[in-house]
Regions:
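The serine-hydrolase catalytic nucleophile loop
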Residues: 145-158, 306
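Catalytic histidine-centered segment of alpha/beta-hydrolase-like enzymes
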Residues: 78, 325-337
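Conserved alpha/beta-hydrolase
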Residues: 161-177
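Alpha/beta-hydrolase active-site loop
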Residues: 182-202
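Conserved alpha/beta-hydrolase "acid-adjacent" motif
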Residues: 301-307
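N-terminal cap/lid segment of alpha/beta-hydrolase-fold proteins
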Residues: 51, 87-131
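Short beta-strand/loop motif that positions the catalytic acidic residue
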Residues: 287-288, 294-296
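Hydrolase active-site cap/lid region
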Residues: 221-273
Length: 350
């Protein structure tokens, strides 16, 4: 189930340019930006066409990591049609070809976890600094509804090299290589519970959870329930973001609608009904949380600042708002990671 929707591609460049240039040369991003005139058609001037052309040039030159990054933007922001799904498949192909050159230990495997009375399979990536002992803790990590485990490789790589822990990287239900499972609050959490259980068997038993954007919703859940030993919430929606009457920016209404499993743009009533189930107020009213770090930028257009401030004053919880930056502090990401990395190390390892 998927759908396309009216979306000005230049709006995506406005919002995501800092993220695009984290993994690709500025001049290449600028060239694609100048060439793109429409979002969905797979033809010259189309988003997927122009990004895929850049990716193909890198692939032909043997620059597989850059090709994977470019194909990642080709399939952005949602697997709404066949050209986007093709771009994802090509991204995975190029990423696997690039893996032998990564400066980290890397393994791609498929795990089977309990899901809704049966089982579900999903690809995961394990990443660690070279020579990391087998008995190190494990940190689950994911992006959100539109930026997934392979897209964020550069960030994961830096974290793995800085943190004496093994990363277990995955895509949320409804996204990336897990789009065969619709995003629901409990179903998505059940998948993550299975990953946590697996993670406890492959290291010293200690498990952290680092969620970015919608991934932060799920890391807030694991943190508030105390089901992991350290939880990082970066730009995560928890309560006000799911309230009736909220607005959307930069195409997020269609991105979220696809992740939730709709086959056409949901009506306001349909979306608000789906959102109501995500509200974490019942968990926020409890006092069962483990150690938590909650971070975001003050100028987030997607997640109200209240969804960060609501954690202030909680036991074993640190809150950091980074000024003059937006969703997930993307334009000041180094500052965010300078808080997150040592906190994870101190909390999981001491």
């Amino acid at each position: 189930m998927s759908f396309t929707w009216p979306l000005d591609p230049q709006d995506l460049f406005v919002e995501r340019y800092p993220q695009m240039t984290l993994g690709l040369p500025v001049d290449e991003v600028d060239a694609v930006r100048a060439a793109v005139t429409e979002m969905w058609p797979d033809r010259p001037g189309g988003w997927v066409y122009e990004w895929s052309a850049l990716a193909a040039r890198h692939a032909e030159a043997g620059h597989h990591r850059l090709a994977a990054q470019a194909y990642g933007w080709a399939k952005f922001p949602s697997l709404a049609d066949d050209p986007k799904r093709t771009a994802l498949a090509r991204q995975v192909e190029q990423y696997v070809l690039a893996a032998p050159g990564f400066p980290v230990e890397f393994e791609r495997r498929t795990l089977t976890v309990p899901y809704r009375g049966g089982d579900a399979a999903l690809p995961i990536h394990l990443m660690a600094a070279p020579g990391l002992p087998a008995d190190a803790p494990v940190v689950l990590a994911s992006g959100g509804v539109d930026s997934w485990k392979t897209d964020l490789h550069g960030m994961w790589e830096q974290l793995a090299l800085a943190l004496p822990a093994r990363l277990l990287l995955f895509d949320l239900a409804g996204t990336g290589e897990t789009t065969h499972l619709p995003m629901t609050p409990d179903g998505g959490a059940e998948v993550i519970a299975g990953l946590v259980a697996f993670a406890r068997t492959i290291g010293d038993g200690g498990v952290g959870h680092f969620g970015i954007s919608m991934g932060g919703y799920y890391s807030a859940r694991t943190g508030l329930t105390g089901s992991v030993d350290a939880s990082v919430v970066l730009g995560g929606p928890v309560e006000r973001a799911f309230a009736p009457g909220r607005g959307f920016a930069f195409g997020m209404e269609g991105i979220v609608g696809n992740a939730l499993g709709f086959d056409a743009m949901p009506s306001t009533a349909e979306r608000e009904d789906a959102f109501a189930a995500f509200d974490l107020r019942p968990l926020l009213d409890q006092d069962a949380n483990g150690p938590m770090l909650v971070v975001n930028g003050t100028e987030d257009v997607h997640v109200p600042v209240d969804d960060t401030l609501v954690f202030e004053g909680r036991r074993d919880t640190r809150v950091e708002l980074i000024p003059d930056t937006g969703h997930c502090a993307i334009s000041r990401f180094g500052e965010a990671m300078a808080v997150i990395t040592p906190w994870l190390k101190d909390t999981l390892i001491g």
